[in-house]
Design a protein with these regions (language model features):
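Conserved active-site tyrosine of GNAT-family acetyltransferases
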Residues: 18-23, 77, 103
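Conserved short beta-strand elements that form part of the metal-binding/catalytic scaffold
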Residues: 28-61, 105-111
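Secondary-structure boundary/capping motif
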Residues: 13-21, 38, 48-50, 97
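Conserved acetyl-CoA-binding loop of GNAT-fold acetyltransferases
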Residues: 24-31, 81-83
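N-terminal beta-strand motif that seeds the catalytic metal site of vicinal oxygen chelate
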Residues: 1-19, 46, 61-65, 112-116
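Vicinal oxygen chelate
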Residues: 5-13, 55-116
Length: 116
């Protein structure tokens, strides 16, 4: 088996409310709307993030986005009105955690020098 790409799914209760959050998070509208209750953003490496309506699973998703410069990303997100709920620095990564309106966890992570 050869894996050629990945799609991460995030379950939300209200797609309209989620669109507002994720458009600010990614800094642009969705790249695709395959169905009325779905929105997809393509990431620079080719992977996709899909936000979709699933009231039973809303709030239980976790998405980690690896960035080159966490401080720069936090500045961009602050301009969009998004503030992290927590920040941490470990031996391998610096992280900042956000929550979408349903409580899904979005983690921005920057590798520490020499770890990856």
């Amino acid at each position: 088996m050869t894996i050629t790409n990945a799609l991460a799914g995030i379950a939300v209760e209200d797609i309209a409310e989620a669109l507002d959050f994720y458009e600010r998070l990614f800094g642009r509208p969705a790249d695709a709307r395959p169905m009325n209750d779905q929105a997809e953003w393509k990431l620079p490496g080719g992977a996709w993030v899909q936000v979709h309506t699933d009231a039973d699973r809303a709030g239980a998703s976790v998405l980690t986005l690896v960035v080159d410069d966490l401080a720069e990303e936090l500045g961009r997100l602050a301009l969009q009105g998004l503030k992290p709920v927590s920040k941490a620095m470990g031996g391998f990564f610096k992280t900042a955690k956000f929550r979408d309106p349903d409580g899904n966890q979005i983690v921005f992570s920057q590798p520490q020098p020499g770890t990856y």
